[in-house]
Amino acid sequence: MKARKYNKEGVFVSEVELPAELFATGISLGAIYDAVKAENANNRQGTHSTKDRSEVRGGGIKPWAQKGTGRARQGSIRAPHFVGGGIIHGPKPRDYSSNLSRSVKKKAVLSILNKKAEENRIAIIEDVEPSSYSTKSIYNILKNMDIAEKGNVGFVVAGENQFLKKSTRNIENLKYVNSKRVVCRDILYNNNLVISESALKELQAQYSKKG
């Protein structure tokens, strides 16, 4: 499987062969589903909370007499059918976190990479290592690659380059992705992936291992 390679200015150089350890493993939609579902669950705070009738302040006395008023009998103004009353079976704080095995996470990442490669949505670029903050220079790279205006772009780089990270922050639809901490959603929900040469080697070392 091949991909287009660009220099650090975003100019096309040649087509390169993608490593089979990453891009010849097949696609498992089930693994992708499980991984994204677990990531979404782990991002939930679970702090939602409502009060039942025993927790709502007030309502300890009957609002009116049991008989003689012509109205339906009531025991408390905090009953669920009153405005301001307790909530029946409402949400309470809970932990939504979900555990995902390393093998499933690995299979999901490889499946997404294979899917993007099959759709010709992966590009390889020489390592971009700016020595200062420059949003314009990063945007010009994407513009030269002709993907600046073609939906979301995931920029996968090796490690944390603060100059590069901050330079990508103000570019709409561009997501900075650290190859050492890949999140499935960050690579799945992008139309195109731009992977630096160092990041490709990092992914190869990390995900080509068995287990």
Swiss-Prot record:
Part of the 50S ribosomal subunit. Residues 42-73 are annotated as: Disordered. This is Large ribosomal subunit protein uL4. One of its GO terms (cellular component) is ribosome. The gene is rplD. GO terms for biological process: translation. PANTHER family: 50S RIBOSOMAL PROTEIN L4 (PTHR10746), LARGE RIBOSOMAL SUBUNIT PROTEIN UL4M (PTHR10746:SF6). Disulfide bonds: none annotated. One of the primary rRNA binding proteins, this protein initially binds near the 5'-end of the 23S rRNA. It is important during the early stages of 50S assembly. It makes multiple contacts with different domains of the 23S rRNA in the assembled 50S subunit and ribosome. It holds the Pfam family Ribosomal_L4. One of its GO terms (molecular function) is rRNA binding. Belongs to the universal ribosomal protein uL4 family. Keywords: Ribonucleoprotein, Ribosomal protein, RNA-binding, rRNA-binding. The keyword Transmembrane does not apply. The keyword Ribonucleoprotein applies.
